[in-house]
Amino acid sequence: MHGGDIYRNNIHFDFSVNINPLGVPSEVQWVLTEAALHANKYLDIYHEQLARDTAAIFDLLETEVVFGNGASELIMAICHTFTPKKAMLLAPSFSGYEHCIIGAAPDCNIIYYYLREEDDFALKEDLLDKIKDEKPNILFLTTPNNPNGLLIEKALLDEIISLCEKQGTVVVVDECFLTLTGKEKELSFAYNIRNYKNVIVLRAFTKTFAIPGVRIGYAICRQSLADAIKMHLPEWNLSIFAQMAGAECLKHQDYILESVRIINDGRTYLSAGLRDLGFKVYPSDSNYILFKCDISDLKEKLLEFNILIRDCSDFKGLTKGFYRVAIKQHNENEGLLSAIESIVKG
């Protein structure tokens, strides 16, 4: 269901998780160590400092930001808030939406819009017709999408949200990977969230700052929606480590710029290398690549090289032979291509 299963295998290079290849900023590592000194104290139940600092980036009020123990906790809270009778999901996409919908609303009718391989899994305008016909209570969109890494075109996303606003459909726009595309300022809906009644933007520190073990995500939406979502979250849901690390992360925009450069270079290199090996590589705007090959057990073969990749055959809409790899540092990308070449040549 997910990448990152390094606990049942001897892994040296984990390409299965889509986190920043630069790793944890050194200043954030230091703050995490310092946070241990505060472990004997009750933390701020409202995490006010982190909320203020985060809201300031988007010129919002702290009451328009909701924090969770990772974006996953927020997805579950959103599903409990609305308990939809009908939901619409893209496929393939992140399986966590379906998991949370079923957990919060077991009788919900889940409608799927299947992204098409012949379109390189890009979202197309016919989704608008499906929304009009089905009139879902809630729609989850991911930009860039997971597992293929493509951004949704801004004009199309604007149309979708406009239609959903008229129909009363809640739209959750998952932007957890958007920062690493380098296009956050021009594409994020967080900056204009007050223009929308029923839009919730999801974001996370996990992928951007390579801290999946800390668990810190946030939702941005109108205050009335934020208040409703908070009612479905536990108190003290952010650890002192999450609060202090999150506040420190916000200070490091230079780290983001360097990350985007490395990711763009690495994506070009890795995509070309996989194509040279005869694989079908799908377009990506993000820090991971979806590809297809005839080697149905490529994941298992790479484990012999102590390399872990994501087998995407369990994604709805994909089959055996689809794999996802994260962009990592150049020497690691080289190592992956070398290992795959050895497998291809037998």
Language-model features, listed with the residues they occupy:
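N-terminal "arm"/small-domain region of PLP-dependent enzymes with the aminotransferase-like
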Residues: 1-41, 134-135, 169
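PLP-dependent aminotransferase class I/II
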Residues: 23-28, 46, 96, 198-282
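Short loop-beta-helix segment that forms the pyridoxal 5′-phosphate
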Residues: 43, 55-77
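PLP-dependent aminotransferase-like
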Residues: 80-141
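Helix C-cap/helix->beta junction micro-motif
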Residues: 104, 134, 166-167, 196, ...
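Active-site phosphate-binding strand-loop segment of PLP-dependent enzymes
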Residues: 118-181
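Conserved PLP-binding catalytic core of the aspartate aminotransferase-like
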Residues: 274-305
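PLP-dependent enzyme catalytic core of the Aspartate aminotransferase-like
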Residues: 304-305, 316-346
